[in-house]
Amino acid sequence: MTEKLKVPSTSRLVLEAAMQLYTTPLQQQYIEAIDFSETSGFYDELKQQYPFIADMICLRKQSIRRMLRERMPAFPGQQVIMLGAGLDPLSLYLLENYPQQISRIIEVDNGYIEEKQQLYEEIMPGNPLIRFIKCDITDTALLWSKLLENGYREEIPAIIVFEGVLHYISNDAFVQVMQLFKTPQQHHLVLLDYSLSEEEVPARFLSYHKAVKEVLENYIGRPVNVNNRADIAGLLYQLDGILDTVEPLCETEKKLTGDNHLFHAPGEGIVEMVSFRI
């Protein structure tokens, strides 16, 4: 293995929060190739302002994996398109668990995707199922051409993973990206999370919500995109999408753990999970 990869603060936060999920051999090899030694003021501040931040991220990732697992039997040979894939080793999880059900995985990101590709190549040389695209996903013309170059086919059912992305782009940009994936049969499934607007957050969690939003906005230098449930319904209406699920994090926790230790009501947890067909 080459020198370990140093990761940006946001990626470190996400990877460390979900470490308990990375238990399979390929995922463990991948995590061992990443350098987590550097301290991060951003990471520490987020944990200080919101003690449940790691739990929230872990539940979000577990929810995405659960929705993938539930979808896999629906169609043979599905495509998986990861937009804003980041450094999460979700592709390794899929290749270890569902190699016969997947025809292609395409990861798209505008940062660290080449380094990630190199790590994957060292772990599983020459794997034919996975492709990597370095691209700003909001550049829809370039994104579309790159998807076609890398084997995306509209007629093959696909799972579009849009995890941890809508917080950082506008709703208009989201709609433009999703327009690329509309199909007459509506056989693509989109999985995403979104940040809740304040009116959706119970009073006891509002201080956490405001604090996390402020830390994130100071770090990225622009507002975080927040939405209420009506906003999400409006986006789906623009896309002629068919809603599958809207899942508050309290429901996610209940499904995954059998209880509610952290989040007890809708609106707690900062984000909610959504899946829809397009």
Model-predicted regions and their roles:
Residues 222-246:
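Short alpha-helix
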Residues 185-198:
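Conserved beta-strand signature within the Rossmann-like core of class I S-adenosyl-L-methionine
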Residues 205-221:
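Short, glycine-/aromatic-enriched active-site segment of Class I SAM-dependent methyltransferases
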